[in-house]
Amino acid sequence: MDQSVEDLFGALRDASASLEVKNSAKEQVSLQQEDVLQIGNNDDEVEIESKFQEIETNLKKLPKLETGFDALANKKKKKNVLPSVETEDKRKPNKSDKNDNDWFTLPKPDDNMRREVQRDLLLIKHRAALDPKRHYKKQRWEVPERFAIGTIIEDKSEFYSSRMNRKERKSTILETLMGDEASNKYFKRKYNEIQEKSTSGRKAHYKKMKEMRKKRR
């Protein structure tokens, strides 16, 4: 029994081996045939492509002939093109066009602005006479061609007593000076002193001399 079984398995092995050899041979033959066909087909395709390329090059060398259809197509293209619209960015002058020196110069005020600020400019010119506790160098100050007026904003770190109220805030320098009590007292005192000096030796002096003479009699 054992020998018969072994013989059967051996026969099966031989048959399977022979089948594998046949199949491999068939596959090799089929692959060779396919390669031959592919090579043949590739050669044909290369020839066709080369012919087409020659035809294209010859056509490109020929001169162009403009027809009515080309003119119509060009007109349609021109109609479809939208007109260029200038945007706001293009209308605005470029910042690069300005000179670098213009960045550091103040604006030149108009005549109306000069009239409005004329009194303030006079006060700045004679600022040495406004406050006795502040002294300035003697100089011939003139109104510059370019100037600007700004407001001082108090810092939040400052105490409330050092800040100005809404009533104290004025639109001009003259109004702020006239609204200050201390400055008004100083101005009145100086005005009286100047008036006494200017009136000395005139009618007041004559009246005083008359009164003195009457008392002597």
Curated annotation (Swiss-Prot):
The keyword Acetylation applies. The modification N-acetylmethionine is found at residue 1. It comes from the Eukaryota. Keywords: Acetylation, Nucleus, Ribosome biogenesis, rRNA processing. It is found in: Nucleus, Nucleolus. Residues 87-101 have a biased composition (Basic and acidic residues). GO terms for cellular component: nucleolus; nucleus. InterPro entries: Fcf2/DNTTIP2, Fcf2_C. Its main location: nucleus. GO terms for biological process: endonucleolytic cleavage in 5'-ETS of tricistronic rRNA transcript (SSU-rRNA, 5.8S rRNA, LSU-rRNA); endonucleolytic cleavage in ITS1 to separate SSU-rRNA from 5.8S rRNA and LSU-rRNA from tricistronic rRNA transcript (SSU-rRNA, 5.8S rRNA, LSU-rRNA); endonucleolytic cleavage to generate mature 5'-end of SSU-rRNA from (SSU-rRNA, 5.8S rRNA, LSU-rRNA); RNA processing. Transmembrane segments: none annotated. Residues 200-217 have a biased composition (Basic residues). The keyword Acetylation applies. Residues 76-111, 193-217 are annotated as: Disordered. Belongs to the FCF2 family. Essential protein involved in pre-rRNA processing and 40S ribosomal subunit assembly. Required for the early cleavage steps of 35S rRNA at the A(0), A(1), and A(2) sites. Interacts with FAF1. This is rRNA-processing protein FCF2.
